């Protein structure tokens, strides 16, 4: 999700945040960070000292992720045969809205500072939470690759098909994903993931040809 400002190195895409643009480049890097953090926590088990605000935020995200498991866990139930199946599935707006509400509440809470209170959390618990996050992110990456016809994309834009008027403006109810021409940045970042040699070799051949 692009919230504003410049989306990256490519100045021609500066208007994408205004088109409900999203960048898969950050998604691939998020998956890498989750993989690294999970590995590090497993190597050094024990307890973590987290600021109260972040500890609460982490647990809230975990609850949202768990409550939306039926929707975002579709990748586990069956494999997608074609991108039409993903488009028919629709957007998981409930998950998106809840995650964004939690993010905005966290930002507002820490904007002027933190309480200074710290909570002890076991690395085992954090690893479980992060593994669940990684599963959700991986599912999203798999969907994106199918939408890209086997070549992992870098950017998407979204068209609002349905909306309702609310007090502060308009609330989107339904989106249509729009594909953007391929950028090499997407496949390059994807190749850094722990997806196995077979998938990477297949991607290489598709990009090459």
Predicted segments, located by residue:
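Acidic, mature catalytic/reactive cores of soluble proteins
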Residues: 1-209
């Amino acid at each position: 999700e692009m919230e504003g400002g410049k989306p990256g190195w490519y100045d021609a895409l500066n208007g994408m945040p205004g088109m409900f643009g999203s960048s898969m480049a950050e998604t691939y890097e998020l998956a890498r960070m989750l993989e690294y953090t999970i590995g590090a926590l497993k190597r050094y088990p024990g307890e973590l000292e987290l600021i109260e605000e972040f500890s609460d935020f982490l647990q809230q995200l975990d609850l949202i992720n768990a409550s939306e498991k039926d929707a975002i866990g579709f990748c586990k139930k069956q494999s997608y045969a074609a991108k039409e199946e993903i488009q028919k599935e629709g957007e998981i707006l409930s998950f998106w809205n809840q995650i964004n509400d939690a993010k905005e509440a966290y930002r507002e809470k820490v904007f002027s500072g933190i309480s200074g209170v710290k909570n002890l959390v076991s690395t085992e618990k954090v690893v479980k939470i992060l593994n669940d996050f990684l599963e959700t992110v991986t599912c999203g990456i798999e969907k994106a690759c199918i939408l890209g016809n086997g070549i992992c994309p870098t950017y998407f834009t979204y068209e609002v098909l349905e909306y309702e008027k609310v007090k502060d403006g308009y609330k989107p109810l339904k989106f249509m994903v729009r594909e953007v021409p391929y950028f090499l940045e997407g496949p390059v970042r994807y190749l850094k993931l722990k997806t196995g040699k077979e998938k990477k070799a297949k991607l290489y051949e598709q990009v090459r040809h």
